[in-house]
From Swiss-Prot:
The keyword Transport applies. The lineage of its organism: Eukaryota, Metazoa, Chordata, Craniata, Vertebrata. This is Solute carrier family 15 member 5. It comes from Homo sapiens. It is found in: Membrane. One of its GO terms (cellular component) is membrane. PANTHER family: OLIGOPEPTIDE TRANSPORTER-RELATED.
């Protein structure tokens, strides 16, 4: 063969490779374009589902105390406890639903059940909350004459079914999935959670403004809008299921496994089991199979990491009790203040919108402080400082609420219409209470992102989802602890510290007591905060060989949907991740 033949063949080979390379590049471009469109579609659907779910949830929370006290005749203490229990149950049900999804039921089947329960609850709530007075639908005259006993039963059933429905939506459709963060360090993780909570509060602000309009309008808007929002949420969720747009998280060490390890360790450390194992360096080692337990070394070491976060979670219980004063003590204080603004009756939900403003304003500043002023090695100290400062702001808010409660009772009484009844309230303008709402908003701005980053980064990546579940669990326990505290204070003080008529009691004493507990909580957290300064401490320890998965997960950059795996660039924007 001639040299010319070799040259032509070589040119053909180069031409062939060029064509194949062009096809590959075009194919990759099409995949990237398709994935970008899918990401935008997922983000829009998630925001709409979150908006509908938050609207129904906050609609119940914002109207619970006025409805229970004015319509159902509950005492202030009973209404506050019921509201706190509803919030706590709504926080805990996603953890329960995730467990059902992983163990017993399929994801799609559970989503269908939860959507039905959510719509059933909103429909029942609308029937119960329908105005008790006569009303007209066109020329048709109707009367809502549901007996009080049946009304109370339907009300509890509606609240329970809404909680179960919310659990399914939050756990499966809108989970706190910080997927794609394994490749980032502490500073980028802080940026993610800053903007994640910024988006959540923007969503909440829109919801509160919408609820404010409903509270200002007639009651029929409530009857029609809550079931409508539930139906809209169901339609969007069904669309996401049909087009495989729901993120599917990986199954890791579960909460039940962690609890089981603790129980097994306590059982096998009994003297009669001590002879079964010698290789014991900690209490949890008793739960290992080689030491007489029934759990693998992998599960035991994962649980050990959770125990290091336990003091952090416990010290957040009292902080949560302060934050939960917005839907309990602060609501009662606002209801008994003058809501009349030049003839315009200000809706109570406006105060919630005001408490959301600090995060919307301060998030960019936190972003600057965490990324520009503090090097990566000092991010842990910065996060601990944020948590301490947030707790101090919460204590200051509750203390100021106590002073304003004393001040409020010195104003002359006026009559004010609320929920169809005329109440005798203080003439102190409700704008005096803005400061305490703002301070609690600042506390949430500082604590929530910092606490989430520590919970996420302080453990290996293979158990971070379970760590976030533990954080959710303690947030729910904080609501129930707050309800228990309200009940104990009511019983011990004979109703004086949480009175049914605020002008005849001393609600300020309850606020001062809560502020004192929060300050003690700050001192306790300061004593353990140093252990959370190094967010990558587990990398320096002699961790099991199976934790080589930690390194592999740092390079795993994929979003997993039903039946599909989409690759995405490591330069993904944090705003897109939050969406």
């Amino acid at each position: 063969m001639s040299v010319t033949g070799f040259t032509i063949t070589d040119e053909k080979v180069h031409l062939y490779h060029s064509i194949e390379k062009e096809k590959t590049v075009r194919h990759i471009g099409d995949l990237c374009s398709s994935h970008s469109v899918k990401k935008i579609q997922v983000g829009i659907c998630l925001l709409l589902v979150e908006l509908c779910e938050r609207f129904t949830f906050f609609e119940v929370v914002c109207n619970m105390i006025p409805f229970c006290t004015i319509k159902l005749g509950y005492h202030n203490c009973q209404a506050a406890i019921l509201n706190l229990c509803f919030i706590g149950t709504s926080i805990l049900t996603p953890v329960f639903v995730r467990w059902l999804t992983d163990v017993y039921l399929g994801r799609n089947k559970l989503v269908y059940i939860c959507l039905f329960l959510h719509f059933l609850g909103t429909a029942l709530l609308s029937v119960v909350a329908f105005p008790l007075e006569d009303f007209y639908l066109g020329t048709y005259h109707a009367v809502n004459n549901i007996p009080k006993t049946e009304q109370h039963r339907l009300f509890y059933v509606a609240l329970l079914t809404i909680c179960l429905g919310i659990g399914g939506v939050r756990a499966i459709v809108c989970p706190l999935g910080a997927f794609g963060l394994q490749e980032y360090g502490s500073q980028k993780t802080m940026s993610f959670f800053n903007w994640f909570y910024w988006l959540m509060n923007l969503n909440a602000t829109i919801v509160f403004l919408g609820i404010s309009y409903i509270q200002h309008s007639q009651a029929w808007a409530l009857v029609l809008l809550i079931p409508f929002m539930s139906m809209l949420m169901a339609v969007i969720t069904l669309h996401m299921i049909y087009y495989n747009l729901i993120y599917q998280s990986e199954k890791r060490c579960s909460l039940l496994t962690g609890v089981g390890v603790l129980v097994s360790a306590l059982k096998t450390c009994h003297p009669q089991y001590c002879h079964l194992g010698r290789d014991v360096t900690s209490q949890l080692d008793h739960a290992k199979e080689k030491n007489g337990g029934c759990y693998s070394e992998l599960h035991v070491e994962d649980t050990t990491f959770f125990l290091t976060l336990l003091p952090l979670f416990i010290f957040q219980l009292l902080y949560r009790m302060c934050i939960m004063q917005i839907p309990s003590g602060y609501y009662l204080q606002t209801m008994n203040s003058n809501l009349n603004l030049d003839g315009f009756l200000l809706p109570i939900a406006v105060m919630n919108a005001i408490s959301s403003l600090p995060l919307l304003i301060l998030a960019p500043f936190l972003e600057y402080f965490s990324t520009c002023l503090f090097p990566s090695k000092r991010v842990g100290s910065f996060l601990s400082t944020c948590i301490i400062a947030g707790n101090l702001f919460a204590a200051l808010s509750v203390m100021i609420a106590g002073f304003f409660e004393i001040h409020r009772k010195h104003f002359p009484a006026v009559e004010q219409p609320l929920s169809g009844k005329v109440l005798t309230v203080s003439s102190m303008p409700c704008f005096y209470l803005i400061l305490q709402y703002v301070l609690l908003g600042v506390a949430e701005t500082l604590v929530n992102p910092a606490l989430s980053v520590i919970s996420y980064r302080f453990v290996p990546s293979n158990v971070r989802g379970t760590s976030m579940n533990f954080l959710t669990l303690f947030n729910g326990f904080g609501c129930f602890t707050g309800a228990l505290l309200v009940k104990l204070v009511y019983l011990i003080s004979d109703g004086n510290w949480f009175p049914n008529t605020l002008n005849k009691g001393n609600l300020e004493s309850f606020f001062f007591f809560l502020a004192s507990l929060t300050l003690l909580n700050v001192l306790g957290f300061c004593s353990v905060s140093q252990r959370y300064c190094n967010l990558n401490h587990f990398n320096a320890q002699n961790i099991r060989g199976s934790n080589l998965e930690e390194t592999l997960l740092l390079h795993e950059k994929s979003l997993k949907f039903y039946g599909s795996i989409q690759e995405f660039s490591s330069s993904i924007d944090l705003w897109e991740t939050a969406l």
